[in-house]
């Protein structure tokens, strides 16, 4: 996907944009996170500092070298009245070795220490990042692609953007089944953006998608999907799930009262 650097919007940039509502350019800001957080502050005319002395605000973002000392100093500043802006609330971060704590987990640690929420959040699920991205492009028919319901899909819904959930990161088919919000499209990865999208169709006994079929077996309290690829089965099952919601409620899926059998 061709894109210029000027068309890329980061949560750090949006967090700093929010900070402008609370503090003027030239203010000294304590940085928690990586180089991207620091650069966003410098670009906006703030003094980015790793030393908490004389800082009037804290911008907390992700960085693999964030330490207990960073979180402690941020907590002390916030308790003393400093403005607190978080770049994002992603609780986890996928790595090659598995799922690791994300910025949201570090924000939660500070929240537990100071007893309050951040004054602003730059990234998803807040819609601020989506609004800025659509203005920068500008977007006429945007599609938000992400791997999380609680941040990506939630942000798209908040901003009125069509969403596509991919299974190449954090979310799994089990998350699709339990989610109380719905992605507009489902894909295995961003590769599905350049392949023909096979959508689900309602049938007499459930839903079909490509070579897959999904049926609700009420006696067993299960939706069973068979045939086709895993993605086709999941798309059919997800459509059937949402057709059943008005009859059985979302909690039936979120709490496992109606289970999903993908034949795996």
Briefly describe each language-model feature range:
Residues 1-9, 16-264:
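Asp-based, Mg2+/Mn2+-dependent phosphohydrolase catalytic module
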